[in-house]
A protein has these predicted regions:
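Flavin-dependent oxidoreductase catalytic cores
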Residues: 1-117
């Protein structure tokens, strides 16, 4: 954030800082101290598309934050944008369901949900 602050002091336009913001407290700190005018949370949102809602409800960090594996970027040219880090999910099916959840209606038939045993 030191570099973002130096840039902000040198230019007369808004500065957006990137660099792995995943916690509400760090985002608030950067904005409150005037380090930058905004932050980019792209990968954090890809990993947890409800991150801002979690922050609004008082959570500082998502339960399974982005691991910075970059699999989202590696898959983006041929597959839907989403988190492909299987270790963040209980199963591959859960991962695929989250990735495909942006499509409404789903592009292919979904299996019927059964109650957990």
């Amino acid at each position: 954030m030191r570099d973002a602050y130096a840039i902000k002091q040198s230019v007369g336009i808004p500065v957006i800082c990137t660099g792995g913001f995943q916690t509400a407290s760090v985002v608030r700190d950067a904005l409150n101290r005037g380090v930058c005018d905004g932050v980019s949370i792209a990968r954090s949102l890809i990993a947890d598309n409800d991150l801002v809602e979690l922050w609004r409800r008082g959570y500082d960090r998502a339960p399974r934050p982005c691991t910075y594996c970059n699999k989202c970027l590696a898959n983006a040219t041929e597959n839907p944008l989403g988190c492909y880090e299987e270790s963040r999910f209980d199963s591959r099916e859960e991962m695929v369901a989250q990735i495909m959840s942006v499509f409404e209606p789903a592009p292919f038939p979904q299996p019927a949900m059964t109650p957990a045993e």
